[in-house]
């Protein structure tokens, strides 16, 4: 059982849902990232997504694009991100998912990346531009090294795509709550609950919902149906306003409030 699967199973055993938090690796620098991973876990993050900065982040809105630019300007590379994960493993065992685009992984080498990521303590990888139909070689490498490959479903996914993803899913399925790029939204789409239930009818793999979740109220609303709630842009936006200890305090307060809201969306068991 992977660390991600074990986390969802333990949360479900206690009736709770998962809070998944996203930060960009290397924003403002990797030393700060290494400090923030344990802080996020201590304040309620059950799983942490580390964004791998990329020069052409087509699925990301302005907030995460700017964050990626800051990280790249600070000299962040994939190999340095893996070294950071390996270093932080002495302080926390929270599941870590690398989220990004296929090009940096391809350039690194698929087998080499999977081996190095597993050795560093990476638990999962989500590549937004690698659909399951094209992921065979990469997934085989990841499977050999015990890394969960996480796929996306969207409001426009038809039954064939849903079955394709659910048949290949490991760790969790990431349901994108809106069409378009990442970013804060004013409300949750009415279709989310129904679409999540359709996915869950096809698979026992947990479903986490992300994109556009910005407030504890929205997180709690999504947690009523989903197995997990992903918050990204609203967290990354704090990096625009705060630095140092002030950033740590702002993150701790916000993530704690998100976790309290997610905990209210309990399972019926």
Curated annotation (Swiss-Prot):
Pfam families: Trp_syntA (PF00290)
EC number: 4.2.1.20
Location of the active site: 49 (proton acceptor), 60 (proton acceptor)
Coiled-coil stretches noted in the UniProt entry, renumbered to this chain: none
Domain of life of the organism encoding this protein: Bacteria
Role, per record: The alpha subunit is responsible for the aldol cleavage of indoleglycerol phosphate to indole and glyceraldehyde 3-phosphate.
Protein name: Tryptophan synthase alpha chain
Lineage: Bacteria, Pseudomonadati, Thermodesulfobacteriota, Desulfuromonadia, Geobacterales
Gene name in the database record: trpA
């Amino acid at each position: 059982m992977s660390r991600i699967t074990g986390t969802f199973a333990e949360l479900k055993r206690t009736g709770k849902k998962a809070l998944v938090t996203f930060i960009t690796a290397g924003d403002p620098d990797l030393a700060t990232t290494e400090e923030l991973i344990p802080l996020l876990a201590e304040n309620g993050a059950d799983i942490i997504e580390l964004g791998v900065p990329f020069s052409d982040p087509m699925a990301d809105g302005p907030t995460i694009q700017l964050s990626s630019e800051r990280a790249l300007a600070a000299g962040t590379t994939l190999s340095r991100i893996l070294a950071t994960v390996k270093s932080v493993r002495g302080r926390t065992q929270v599941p870590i998912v690398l989220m990004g685009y296929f090009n940096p992984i391809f350039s690194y080498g698929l087998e080499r990346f999977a081996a190095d990521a597993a050795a560093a303590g990476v638990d999962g990888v989500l590549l937004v531009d690698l659909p399951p139909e094209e992921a065979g070689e990469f997934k085989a490498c990841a499977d050999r090294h015990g890394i969960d490959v996480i796929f996306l479903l969207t409001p426009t996914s038809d039954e064939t795509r849903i079955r394709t993803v659910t048949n290949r899913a490991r760790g969790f399925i990431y349901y994108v709550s809106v069409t378009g790029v990442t970013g804060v939204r004013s409300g949750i789409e009415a279709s989310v609950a129904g679409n999540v239930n359709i996915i869950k009818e096809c698979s026992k793999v947990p479903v986490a919902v992300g994109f556009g979740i910005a407030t504890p109220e929205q997180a709690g609303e999504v947690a009523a149906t989903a197995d997990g709630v992903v918050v990204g842009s609203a967290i990354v936006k704090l990096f625009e306003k705060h630095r140092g200890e002030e950033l740590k305090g702002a993150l701790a307060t916000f993530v704690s409030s998100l976790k309290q809201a997610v905990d209210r969306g309990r399972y019926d068991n």
